[in-house]
Amino acid sequence: MTNVFTIDAFREEVKKKYAPVLIGLSDDVTVELKPLLKLGQKAREAVVEVFKEFADIPDLEEDDDDELVDEYSLQVCDIIAKAFRLIATKPKKLIAALDEEPDPRIRAELYAAVLNTWKRETQLGGSRALAELIDKFGGAILADLLQYYRVDLRDLFRDEDPLSPRFVLSLVLCLPKDGAFYAERRGGQQYRGWTEDRYALADIYDAIQAGNHILLLANRDPKKPKPKAPKSYPRPDDLEKTTPKPGSFAAMVVRAKKAARERREREEESAE
């Protein structure tokens, strides 16, 4: 498993508190660049999509003319400006201040410098990976962190002295395999507790049952019916969806949905 914490990383965590990036535009104007984790899910996804646009900008060659280099530089500025509109508290003022630089190349470097500062100070790599995990398995991660580490995931979003994304991600990556997080990743809470040891015990149980069955068959009274074959120990992988019993609430819901679908299909055919 990847080691996301080194001695230098620990030193950085101790010396510096995790906080939003503040960009001073003047004595009385400050722009805050919000950490990725403090954005809404749609905004986070939009930021990720913006970064993908950099792949469309071709690599510069030594013999490229100045006009082409300037054009690429302006494209870089436009892409980063899209990100600023999503993460900055005052994006128009920030973009206007950066656009005061007339030289496209220097302007692009200014845009990139601000963006790289935000990426470094907010631990973008850890934030992005952790945000994706929380979006998918937030409840399970919350439960496991409290159970195994006594860490409250909500402290990640505190305004004062919040937990760092890299710290929380390290804990998540080392969660036990029999916990709620790994169960959700495998398909649901029915997998909780099903580690390699549990599967091995289930296999041993089945083998013992099979051996006992063979012994019964070999020593049974021919006049009596054969003993039934033993059932395998139930495993979460073997669980199948059962059809709702007639008359149950689930069956009525299924029947109502089917009737609504058939009625909608008839209406569509009549409209045609």
UniProtKB/Swiss-Prot annotation:
Pfam families: GP24_25
Similarity comment: family membership: Belongs to the L5likevirus tail assembly protein family.
UniProt keyword list: Viral release from host cell, Viral tail assembly
Region described as Disordered: 219-272
Domain of life the protein comes from: Viruses
Example GO BP: viral translational frameshifting
Biased composition (Basic and acidic residues): 234-243, 262-272
Protein role: Promotes tail assembly by creating a scaffold for the tail tube proteins. The tail assembly proteins Gp24 and Gp25 would wrap the linear tape measure protein to create a tail assembly scaffold. It would allow polymerization of tail tube protein during which Gp24 and Gp25 are released and therefore are absent from the mature virion. The tail assembly protein Gp25 is produced by a rare -1 ribosomal frameshift. The ratio Gp24/Gp25 is important for proper tail assembly.
Protein name as catalogued: Tail assembly protein Gp25
Oligomeric form and interacting partners: Interacts with tail assembly protein Gp24 and tape measure protein.
